[in-house]
Regions:
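Substrate-binding clefts and catalytic carboxylate motifs of secreted carbohydrate-active enzymes
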Residues: 1-109
Length: 109
């Protein structure tokens, strides 16, 4: 789906920045989407970094007081800096050509 959207938008001959791409519960994943965005030379913005007050770990339309989701929507880190999913951190680092010490965090709750 994204590929077709990118093809259509390329016709504008303008720089592209994708701001709404990461939504784990809808099938968007760092390991699948970052390489595509990189290959297409499309910038991307990721909403949510640390699980906290903005509650971007919750999916759109979440009901206040509902149980915590098994799968986070956006965020990638717990408040203490531990990765939500160390494999995702490795995928992000691979896309960026960097490495960190974050990949050895706790497992998903």
């Amino acid at each position: 789906v994204l590929q077709r959207i990118f093809e259509r938008l390329r016709k504008t001959e303008r720089p592209l920045l994708c701001t709404e791409w990461m939504a784990r519960t809808l099938g968007s994943r760092f390991e699948t989407h970052l390489p595509l965005l990189q290959a297409e030379r499309i910038g991307s913005w990721h909403w949510g970094l640390v699980r906290g007050r903005t509650q971007t770990h919750l999916p759109w339309g979440s009901i206040e007081g509902a149980p915590e989701p098994g799968t986070w929507f956006h965020d990638i880190l717990y408040a203490d800096g531990t990765p939500y999913d160390p494999a995702e951190i490795a995928s992000i680092e691979a896309s960026l050509g960097t490495s960190s010490r974050m990949g050895n965090g706790r497992s998903k709750e």
